[in-house]
UniProtKB/Swiss-Prot annotation:
It catalyses: UDP-N-acetyl-alpha-D-mannosaminouronate + N-acetyl-alpha-D-glucosaminyl-di-trans,octa-cis-undecaprenyl diphosphate = beta-D-ManNAcA-(1->4)-alpha-D-GlcNAc-di-trans,octa-cis-undecaprenyl diphosphate + UDP + H(+). GO terms for molecular function: lipopolysaccharide N-acetylmannosaminouronosyltransferase activity. Belongs to the glycosyltransferase 26 family. Pathway: Bacterial outer membrane biogenesis; enterobacterial common antigen biosynthesis. Catalyzes the synthesis of Und-PP-GlcNAc-ManNAcA (Lipid II), the second lipid-linked intermediate involved in enterobacterial common antigen (ECA) synthesis. InterPro entries: UDP-ManNAcA_Trfase_WecG (IPR023085), WecG_TagA_CpsF (IPR004629). This is UDP-N-acetyl-D-mannosaminuronic acid transferase. The gene is wecG. GO terms for biological process: enterobacterial common antigen biosynthetic process. It comes from Citrobacter koseri (strain ATCC BAA-895 / CDC 4225-83 / SGSC4696).
């Protein structure tokens, strides 16, 4: 019988990535034995690996996260190339967040939301409650001052949240999660970037077929040609992949 509550680790450029077979495996792992895992979830794609290579602060933030998983198809292919026996699949962060929220709603797990524009955050809360009856115990939009951070951490701690999701983009969200965990370590933290915008329909995600083919990056590039400079950086990652330098 396959064990769905544990998962192997695979090393790419020194980063230890969790090898989830599929979304159900990820959920069973995070909710093992009816207990929500505690720690920080960080989605890893090729761009984030490049940033971690060049920025020691980002590298330290990622290294400190307990649950690093393959969000990008390039990373999945690299794991499979380096470890031919690996049964690992892409788990998109946006999809994982929705599945976590659905599971949290089913089990009554308390959730705290951070980030996004005020109106987007309000719509996210309303939709989560309507769709999955999520127990949202608090929220804070992304427009707060540095001197308000400590008060936010105290609010999160007082709320008793077991899941805290932060939509502020990298590395801001990773920094906030790291600092908040000092005050409130008894939760699963997840950085979700622009997920609230996608969830509420403010930003259109790539059609399912593009996602299935691993071409979500191309869809975003065609939709936003200004991303070309960011995409050209990925040539360095391709060199790592094809020269076996992972």
């Amino acid at each position: 019988m396959t064990d769905n509550t544990t998962a192997p680790l695979y090393s790419l450029r020194g980063l230890q990535l969790i090898g989830w077979r599929d979304m159900q495996h990820a959920l069973n792992y995070l909710f093992a034995d009816g207990q929500m895992k505690q720690g920080t979830l960080v989605a890893i794609n090729a761009e984030k690996m490049l940033t971690a290579e060049d920025d020691p602060e980002v590298r330290a933030l990622i290294d400190a996260a307990e649950f690093k998983y393959a969000d990008g198809i390039s990373v999945v292919r690299s794991v499979r190339k380096k470890f031919p026996q690996a049964q690992v699949s892409r788990v998109a962060g946006a999809d994982l967040w929705e599945e976590l929220m659905a599971r949290a709603g089913k089990e009554g797990t308390p959730v705290f939301l951070v980030g996004g524009k005020p109106e987007v955050l309000a719509q996210t809360e309303a939709k989560l409650r309507a769709q999955w009856n999520v127990n949202i115990v608090g929220s804070q939009d992304g427009y707060f001052k540095p001197e308000q951070r400590q008060a936010l951490f105290e609010r999160i701690h007082a709320s008793g949240a077991k899941i805290v999701t932060v939509a502020m983009g990298s590395p801001k969200q990773e920094i906030l999660m790291r600092d908040c965990r000092v005050i409130h370590p008894q939760a699963l933290y997840m950085g979700v970037g622009g997920t609230y915008d996608v969830f509420t329909g403010h930003v259109k995600r790539a059609p399912k077929m593009w996602q299935t083919l691993g071409l979500e990056w191309l869809y975003r590039l065609l939709s936003q040609p200004s991303r070309i400079t960011r995409q050209l950086r990925l040539l360095r990652y391709l060199r790592w992949h094809y020269t076996g330098n992972l």
